[in-house]
């Protein structure tokens, strides 16, 4: 029978538990406390850098998604220019939305033409027609008579002119016809993802190399990306395109996007003295159309 007044030897907080295994401290006569567990290894500088890098990528993605789309995005603070490496990721999301709409339309029996029209409309809605607006403004400004100051003034005008309206009609027709020609949902989805990723992936390159047409406005507020950001954007866009379509088709599509970018950039330098937010929108739209036209012949 156990004595109720005797301390429980299994109680690690009692006196008996203290002196059961540990020898007494000669200075105090009390049992020395048991050594606790060894502390675990602390994360080294490489692990911390990895965590910080992942956090920076997440921040850049949310920043670009919130800027380029109307989708609910986590509000974050940061520089849009330095987040430029995530431009293709936001484009990929837009392409996924368009591809999903096309797939659903195709599954319920819509024709390829009508499903393509709905897919293009969905991408315009999800982006708030941000780039389409830039294309229309640039075409209106290029169609006006006058010098650089006059053209820049027209770029600020939010009203849609004849040239801008025609540009939107032709751009929509080209995109819809290209998607309808691909027909198969898997081809259309891949083409949309590649086109939207690549057409946004070239924008940091323009922003890092061209002069601003004016010191204020959306483009000026975004800042100038570093060359490293521009190259990262191109690499990520190409990787996304390779996964979405095929390596050869993705490479040709990137070259088509770069060619369209170079042509619009040269024109903008002569006509506006540099680039603006509207010019970037026009570059995205022309690059997107060039990519889709090339993909029709390749996939």
Which stretches of residues belong to each language-model region?
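Hydrophobic alpha-helical transmembrane segments
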Residues: 1-128, 149-152, 157-299
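Glycine/small-residue-rich loop that forms an oxyanion/phosphate-binding "nest" at active or ligand-binding sites
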Residues: 133-136, 140-144, 152-153
């Amino acid at each position: 029978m156990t004595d109720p007044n005797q301390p429980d030897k299994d109680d690690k907080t009692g006196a008996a538990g203290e002196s059961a295994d540990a020898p007494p401290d000669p200075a105090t006569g009390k049992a020395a406390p048991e050594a606790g567990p060894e502390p675990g290894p602390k994360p080294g500088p490489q692990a911390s850098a990895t965590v910080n890098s992942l956090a920076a990528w997440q921040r850049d993605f949310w920043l670009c998604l919130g800027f380029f789309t109307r989708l609910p995005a986590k509000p974050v603070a940061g520089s849009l220019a330095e987040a430029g490496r995530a431009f293709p990721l936001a484009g990929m999301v837009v392409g996924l939305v368009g591809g999903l709409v096309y797939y659903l339309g195709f599954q319920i029996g819509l024709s390829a033409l009508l499903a393509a029209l709905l897919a293009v409309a969905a991408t315009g809605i999800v982006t708030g027609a941000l780039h389409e607006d830039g294309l229309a403004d640039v075409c209106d400004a290029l169609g006006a008579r006058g010098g650089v100051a006059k053209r820049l003034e027209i770029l600020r005008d939010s009203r849609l002119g004849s040239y801008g309206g025609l540009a939107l009609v032709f751009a929509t027709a080209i995109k819809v016809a290209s998607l309808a020609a691909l027909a198969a949902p898997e081809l259309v989805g891949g083409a949309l993802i590649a086109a939207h990723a690549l057409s946004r992936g070239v924008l940091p390159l323009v922003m890092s190399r061209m002069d601003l047409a004016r010191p204020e406005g959306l483009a000026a507020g975004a800042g100038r990306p570093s060359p490293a950001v521009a190259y990262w954007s191109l690499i990520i866009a190409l990787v996304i395109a390779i996964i979405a379509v095929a390596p050869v088709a993705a490479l040709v599509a990137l070259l088509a996007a770069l060619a369209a970018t170079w042509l619009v950039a040269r024109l903008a330098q002569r006509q506006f003295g540099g680039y603006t937010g509207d010019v970037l929108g026009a570059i995205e739209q022309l690059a997107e159309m060039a990519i889709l036209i090339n993909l029709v012949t390749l996939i």
